């Protein structure tokens, strides 16, 4: 029964087996090495432990606070039947074949996730993230020291047998040395790029730190002088400008700066889920919050944030900001505003009915022009702005963005020309 259900109470085991309470208790005692006792009193359940690719089925959960202190806040248990039992900060989450919303940041994804999959391939982990089982997701999380958010899985002082992913490299303060360091780091990453990444529109990234310990995420272009390199050069400059525009209009964004070398262009963003050298804040995507607390099917940022505000889990002001940024994105050609591209802060004291706060905006750029394997770096072409977005408060911000881009001396003539057309259409 437990091998199929994963988790059951004594009464449920009695009903499914037809055995008495005494018999069930005796059988459970005989399996004490494999059966986990989870919960207290009436909430007590029994689960059949399933190892995490040879590692213990039960792993500690730590919450890293803003000062960098690790506090043990719970235990994660992987059970037979792909059931996950999580006791976290006094709350219990039970899911099947998936992480609960609050642990979603532990799930490797995107470009950095694919690099991690390659790093772990010798351990038998699938190279395709889309094929990862819950066991693979947890195994990978146990090998990462710097996952997004404030929750860490596994003992921080005891690296797992395959070894934790390498420590973050430090970047020099001055621009020339920083560019040289980034050139070397990006070259190292490029040598291990997942197949098709550079040509498939997937943005290459790496993690690093400034000399003072500030954590940064770095996007970088393919080599300059190539069609894809020149296109991503334009797009990264447009992203920096879009974030500057939002910030100038009172909307918090990731703090970014451009760094250039003769071979590549870099967008360096300070991580807002980190504080100083070791402090952290917990951050989940709007998609994870939707899964946890919104009954309707996911549509977009605006709808989810409006629903969270109605449920008093997000302020009306934050919901309005999310709507404004959504319309701004549509007006500047951001076709990639998926459920993982808007972050919400949450703290450990409100996990049953959390009160979210919108995080700084990131990944805001005209992705409609990103290169891909089918069309390559197609010529820039103007588009008709969404009518509803043109009627929103974001229109003025979009006009400011297009004017600034049309006058920029850091992007190509093609991008300046299409930006000028968009000034007239917005």
Regions found by a protein language model. Give the residues of each.
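Phosphate/dinucleotide-binding and metal-coordinating scaffold of catalytic cores
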Residues: 3-339, 343-426
């Amino acid at each position: 029964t437990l091998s199929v259900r994963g988790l059951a109470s004594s009464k449920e085991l009695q009903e499914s087996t037809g055995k008495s309470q005494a018999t069930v208790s005796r059988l459970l005692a005989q399996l004490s090495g494999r059966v986990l006792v989870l919960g207290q009193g009436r909430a007590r359940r029994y689960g059949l432990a399933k190892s995490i690719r040879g590692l213990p089925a039960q792993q500690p959960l730590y919450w890293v606070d803003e000062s960098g202190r690790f506090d043990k806040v719970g235990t994660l248990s992987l059970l037979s039947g792909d059931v996950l039992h999580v006791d976290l900060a006094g709350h219990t989450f039970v899911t099947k074949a998936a992480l609960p919303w609050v642990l979603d940041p532990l799930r490797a994804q995107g470009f950095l996730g694919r690099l991690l999959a390659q790093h772990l391939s010798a351990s038998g982990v699938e190279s395709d993230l889309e094929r990862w089982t819950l066991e693979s997701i947890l195994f990978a999380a146990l090998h990462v020291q710097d996952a997004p958010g404030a929750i860490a899985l596994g003992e921080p002082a005891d690296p797992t047998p395959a070894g934790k992913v390498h420590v973050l490299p430090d970047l020099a303060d001055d621009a020339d040395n920083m560019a040289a360091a980034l050139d070397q780091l990006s070259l190292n990453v490029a040598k291990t790029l997942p197949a098709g990444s550079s040509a498939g529109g997937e943005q290459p990234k790496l993690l690093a730190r400034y000399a003072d310990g500030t954590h940064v995420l770095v996007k970088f272009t393919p080599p300059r002088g190539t069609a894809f390199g020149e296109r991503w050069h334009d797009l990264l400059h447009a992203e920096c400008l879009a974030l500057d525009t939002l910030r100038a209009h009172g909307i918090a964004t990731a703090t970014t700066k451009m760094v250039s070398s003769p071979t590549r262009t870099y967008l360096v963003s300070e991580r807002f889920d980190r504080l100083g050298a070791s402090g952290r804040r917990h951050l989940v995507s709007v998609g994870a919050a939707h899964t946890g607390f919104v009954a309707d099917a996911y549509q977009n940022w605006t709808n989810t944030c409006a629903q969270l505000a109605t449920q008093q889990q997000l302020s009306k002001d934050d919901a309005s900001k999310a709507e404004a940024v959504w319309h701004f994105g549509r007006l500047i050609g951001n076709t990639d505003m998926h459920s993982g591209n808007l972050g919400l802060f949450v703290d450990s004291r409100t996990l049953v009915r959390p009160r979210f706060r919108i995080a700084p905006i990131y990944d805001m750029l005209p992705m409609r022009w990103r290169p891909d394997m089918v069309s390559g770096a197609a010529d820039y072409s103007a588009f008709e702005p969404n009518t509803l977005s043109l009627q929103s408060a974001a229109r003025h911000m979009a006009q400011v963005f297009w004017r600034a881009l049309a006058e920029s001396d850091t992007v190509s003539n093609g991008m300046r020309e299409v930006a000028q057309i968009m000034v007239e259409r917005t």
